[in-house]
Amino acid sequence: MTMFMPTPSQFDPDERGHFGKFGGRFVPETLMPALLELESAYNELRFDREFWSEVDYYLKEYVGRPSPLYYAERLSDELGAKIYLKREDLNHTGAHKINNTVIQGLLAKRLGKKKIIAETGAGQHGVATATIAALLGLECEVFMGSKDTARQELNVFRMKLLSSKVQSVESGSKTLKDAMNEAIRHWVTHARDTFYIIGTVAGPHPYPMMVRDFQSVISFEAKKQILEKEERLPDYVIACIGGGSNAAGMFARFLDEESVRCIGIEAGGLGIESHHHGASLAKGSPGILHGQMSYLLQDSEGQIEEAYSISAGLDYPGIGPEHAYLFESGAAEYDHVTDAEALEAFVWLSQKEGIIPAFESAHAIAYLKKARERFKDKVVIVSLSGRGDKDMIQAKNLLNFH
């Protein structure tokens, strides 16, 4: 397989970091120098073959890429479709998150930073960041809402084992949004020696573009793999969506293809009329959060509302600005599935294919059932963004197996 590198796209933001009206850089003055330094460094390296050959080495030898595109035969038989799973769950650390952290870690080293910080929800991005810090010999601190540290205690232990410090955040809803607030607050006062590794396609420019570029390795591989297997492009590409990085990576190389429909699946929680969900596009409105303009869950006064999902990685009350743009322009489509549907799909995939997905990925799998009629006789790729190890304790408490 030829070496992965980002390619310019019609969906790139403008020079001020806007995807249409979304995105931008709404941050305190004190952060502008760090963001401008990062933007300038990334612009230099974005198409630099030497940098990407170093990245290529780590993606292959350390992360274990390319990840397989697996034909799910028993799912396909049941649905009357050809279902392929892009196996991001097989990456080192068990999810797509490491694609991004390994490249941001190499960028931090290039900039001479000694310390990296990150926010995390489900803990997967925190573990991936702590992993890269250990690999590259960097100091690491991870911010995590106290609600998430309680439901993801194994990932908290993993981060500590990897010699990272974990800051439990007690403010606000004590989840991902608040962890991100604290990480940004910390960065404001430590920007000189600290690199902030954002885990999703959100935040101020250049992060949404950078993280999308780094995760686009998913569709770079999947496109080649499906052409080898089917000698044609898929009809549909599906990915779950919280902040939206695995979906952005899965969509990136397919968005330019007229024949391919990209579908992002939000967290429907207890139902999108219930106020207990994470469906920012279905139920949100444009506003500003974490340095960007995008769709947010907010009340009539513009106060951010708490997002909810069975999955700690999907309960973010906003969405990456590129997704907001793709949603409004119709270049991609978005739907949602409930906790109950995701849990059913979690069991379904486990028992049909012997693959236990993360709760996040189970949302994308659930959509195959929810919209099964539209997939009949079609070729479909689903991003299996992570494995279910981290969700075992929660699943055991929710499912009654005798």
Swiss-Prot record:
Cofactor(s) it depends on: pyridoxal 5'-phosphate
One Pfam family name is PALP
According to UniProt, the name of this protein is Tryptophan synthase beta chain 2
EC category name: lyase
Q: By its UniProt entry, which InterPro entries does this protein fall under?
A: Trp_synth_b_CS (IPR006653), Trp_synth_beta (IPR006654), Trp_synth_beta/beta-like (IPR023026), TrpB-like_PALP (IPR001926), TrpB-like_PALP_sf (IPR036052)
This protein's gene is called trpB2
UniProt keyword annotation of Transport present: no
The annotated pathway is: Amino-acid biosynthesis; L-tryptophan biosynthesis; L-tryptophan from chorismate: step 5/5
Question: Which PANTHER family has this protein been placed in?
Answer: TRYPTOPHAN SYNTHASE (PTHR48077:SF3), TRYPTOPHAN SYNTHASE-RELATED (PTHR48077)
Q: Out of the domains of life, which is the source?
A: Bacteria
Known SUPFAM superfamilies for this protein?
A: Tryptophan synthase beta subunit-like PLP-dependent enzymes
Q: Name positions with the PTM N6-(pyridoxal phosphate)lysine.
A: K97
Quick one: a GO cellular component term? Answer: cytoplasm
- Transmembrane regions listed in the UniProt entry: none
Q: What is its EC number?
A: 4.2.1.20
Report the catalytic activity.
(1S,2R)-1-C-(indol-3-yl)glycerol 3-phosphate + L-serine = D-glyceraldehyde 3-phosphate + L-tryptophan + H2O
Q: Which family does it belong to?
A: Belongs to the TrpB family.
Q: Does the keyword Membrane apply?
A: no
Q: How does it assemble?
A: Tetramer of two alpha and two beta chains.
The record, for PROSITE patterns, names: TRP_SYNTHASE_BETA
| Job description of the protein | The beta subunit is responsible for the synthesis of L-tryptophan from indole and L-serine.
* Entry's Gene Ontology molecular function annotations: tryptophan synthase activity
Annotated source species: Wolinella succinogenes (strain ATCC 29543 / DSM 1740 / CCUG 13145 / JCM 31913 / LMG 7466 / NCTC 11488 / FDC 602W)
Q: Which UniProt keywords apply?
A: Amino-acid biosynthesis, Aromatic amino acid biosynthesis, Lyase, Pyridoxal phosphate, Tryptophan biosynthesis
